[in-house]
Regions:
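Conserved pre-motif C helix in the palm subdomain of viral-like polymerases
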Residues: 188-195, 394, 546-566
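Short active-site loop/helix that positions an aromatic residue
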Residues: 39-42, 106-117, 130-133, 273-280, ...
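Active-site palm subdomain of RNA-directed nucleic acid polymerases
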Residues: 204-214, 560-583
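A common structural junction motif
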Residues: 482, 598-608
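Conserved beta-strand -> loop -> alpha-helix junction used to position metal-binding or nucleic-acid-contacting
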Residues: 118-135, 142-144, 426-430
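Nucleic-acid-processing active sites and adjacent nucleic-acid-binding tracks
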Residues: 65-100
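Acidic beta-strand-to-loop metal/phosphate-binding motif
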Residues: 32, 97-108, 390
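Conserved "right-hand" nucleotidyltransferase catalytic core of DNA-directed polymerases
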Residues: 2-76, 120, 137, 147-372, ...
């Protein structure tokens, strides 16, 4: 046994016994599976260990209608069945063509496949289903969902008592316990997963989520393969770059001290304020607390030398302290196997449906900084014999905005003209708007995205680097020349206020289930029952509906990107990474790149054609 010496522990006798047989499940249409593992990846905060070879499966729980069983084979505390027999049983079950149901399938399927056990048949993830059914939940744990949807609670008392008696963490070190104290718990996990799926099937149908559910279900195996393969990274080059950046940061800090006469903590607004005060320079304060406020946008737009030095020092500190340190921490044999969050979950994910990453978050790798962005991105390289291909949706969000504005009735004023303009693949939404309004493109982009995101005037003023009054004038000017953005925003807000939900192109629901008082001021959003009890039924309104347009655009962008990933994979192209509006692939040549570009171009039909721009290079940073 690979766990080393067997641990002998003494406990009161459990009610659970090992299964008497390896039950034939070939006639069942649905099988729920739950694994117990020794996970040295999770235990060392490196993400699930299956992709990096840290840990192993120690037990296999399975449930079908009317029967459940737990088959332990790697518990340090003993009570194991014959490992070869259990592994064969696992393999036989996973080879069946029926539907396999998991809670957090990326974890369990990842471990199975890393152990040489491919999972055949459709894969269902009840955690993904739960996030589609309600993206605003506090928790997506099996226990929390079972309580809310099944009125059942996991029986963990015996497990916790046994763990506490011997100083063992009941979750991270469950593999150390005798199997008899884990068996019932493991069986119940599989059984509850099966029961949840019966309930969620009905919810998906009732809420008309079948189309988007099928897309998410098909995407799951692709995400597992992406993490399994990982991203190649040049470790020695990363170490050298980190050393170089640390030296550059020290030089910048010396320059800041020379300019201001004092040492400045570049991340502490109060300390920066002292430097500005000493130099008799103005700076903004927060509206509520009147504390100094030095946002990155404000500093970037400030022309004073010290502001620019602080911007540079902050950037370089973040580059080496966040990005390069993460590369060193998470790389295994020259690859990074970041976790991909498909939807909302207890360990991350977005409410919009967009993919996110953790352990590490490669979506934070900088792109805009012209000096350091390419240097850090150049650390990531394709497989041997390939080029790195970066495929980017050009102006994905503005195109979505124009599509929806033109889709309401005969189209909001100005939207159809933009639809026509977008028939030219070189059309630039922000430049077109800038020309109409008579402002700079950067201002047009900031205002446009601010309106799409539901940004307030104060925040927009800081982003633009102007006063609140000047920002207000620019917004009025913008809305006069490009009225459809505000009209669409108001329409989305109204729909969210009235119905509490809006839907994306694929039918993904964006819900607004929290409530707040109608009284002016800042308030905590609450559940309907709590808000009614506190403020009265007639004095409450739905919260966060000003974000409705943003939710619609982000959700539709997620639909488009995910459908593209499916289409590309079906054509034989497995993505390396998905970063915001960008998909990265291993690409052989220009012909291969054109095939991917064509697949990505219009996976979902919109009034405005999608444009995918791509670049090829020896690394991510060189892909131009």
């Amino acid at each position: 046994m690979s766990n080393g010496l067997q641990l002998t522990l003494t406990f009161k006798k459990s009610m659970w016994n090992t299964p008497m047989e390896y039950k034939d499940l070939s006639q069942y249409k649905e099988i729920a599976i739950d694994l117990e593992t020794k996970d040295d990846g999770l235990n060392n905060k490196l993400g699930a260990g299956w992709a990096i070879g840290k840990g192993e499966i120690v037990g296999f729980a399975v449930a079908v209608e009317g029967w459940k069983g737990y088959f332990p084979f790697g518990h340090l505390g003993g009570g194991n069945m014959i490992p070869e027999q259990v592994k064969k049983y696992m393999k036989d079950i996973c080879a069946l063509p029926c539907t396999k149901i998991f809670h957090n399938a990326q974890y369990d399927v990842g471990w199975l496949e890393a152990s040489g056990i491919p999972v055949h048949g459709p894969i269902v993830d009840t955690m993904i289903a739960a996030a589609l059914i309600d993206e605003n939940r506090f928790s997506y744990s099996l226990n929390a969902l079972s309580v809310d949807y099944l009125n059942e609670i996991k029986a963990e008392t015996e497990l916790r008592e046994a763990a506490a008696a011997h100083g063992i963490d009941p979750k991270a070190e469950m593999w150390k316990l005798p199997a008899e104290h884990v068996g019932y718990y493991a069986e119940q996990d599989a059984e509850l997963t099966l029961k949840l799926w019966q309930r969620f099937k009905q919810e998906i149908a009732t809420q008309s989520l079948t189309t988007v559910w099928e897309m998410e279900q098909q995407l799951l195996p692709i995400l597992i393969k992406m993490r399994q393969r990982g991203v190649r990274v040049q470790v020695e080059k990363a170490e050298a770059l980190q050393k170089e950046m640390k030296n550059q940061e020290q030089e910048l800090l010396k320059a800041i001290k020379k300019e201001s006469g004092i040492e400045v903590d570049i991340w502490a607004s109060r300390q920066i304020a002292k430097a500005f005060d000493k130099m008799k320079l103005d700076y903004p304060r927060t509206e509520k607390t009147k504390e100094p406020s030095f946002t990155q946008n404000w500093l970037i737009n400030n022309k004073n030398k010290i502001a620019q030095l602080i911007v540079s020092a902050r950037e370089i500190n973040k580059f080496h302290g966040t990005f390069l340190s993460s590369i060193m921490k998470y790389q295994v044999n020259g690859r990074i196997h970041g976790e991909i969050n498909q939807l909302r979950g207890d360990n991350g994910g977005t409410v919009s449906g967009r993919l996110s990453m953790s352990n590490p978050n490669l979506q934070q790798v900088p792109a805009r900084n012209k000096d350091f962005g390419p240097k850090i991105r150049s650390l990531f390289i394709p497989e041997d014999g390939y080029k790195w291909g970066s495929f980017d949706y050009s102006q994905q969000e503005p195109r979505m905005t124009v599509h929806y504005a033109a889709s309401i009735g005969e189209g909001y004023e100005g939207s159809n003209e933009l639809v026509q303009a977008y028939q030219n693949s070189q059309a630039d939404f922000h430049q077109t708007v800038a020309d109409l309004v008579g402002i700079e493109r950067t201002q047009a982009k900031t205002i446009g995205l601010g309106l799409m995101y539901g940004m307030g005037k104060q925040k927009l003023a800081i982003s633009l680097g102007v006063s609140k009054d000047e920002a207000n004038e620019l917004i009025i000017k913008y809305n006069k020349k490009v009225p459809f953005v505000k009209k669409l925003s108001d329409r989305c807000k109204y729909a969210a206020d009235e119905k509490g939900v809006i839907r994306t192109k694929k039918g993904r629901k964006c819900r607004f289930d929290m409530w707040e008082t109608r009284d002016f001021g800042l308030h905590v959003a609450e559940k309907y029952e709590d808000a009614v009890a506190k403020y009265g039924k007639d004095n409450i309104k739905r919260a966060f509906t000003y974000k409705a347009l943003n939710r619609l655009i982000q959700g539709s962008s997620a639909d488009q990107t995910k459908q593209s990933m499916l289409d590309c994979y079906e054509d034989g192209h497995l993505p390396i990474l998905q970063i915001h509006d960008e998909l990265c692939f291993n690409v052989k040549d220009e012909k291969h790149a054109k095939q991917i570009q064509k697949k990505m171009q219009n996976p979902i039909e919109f009034k405005v054609p999608s444009v995918v721009e791509y670049g090829l290079g020896e690394s991510w940073g060189d892909a131009k």
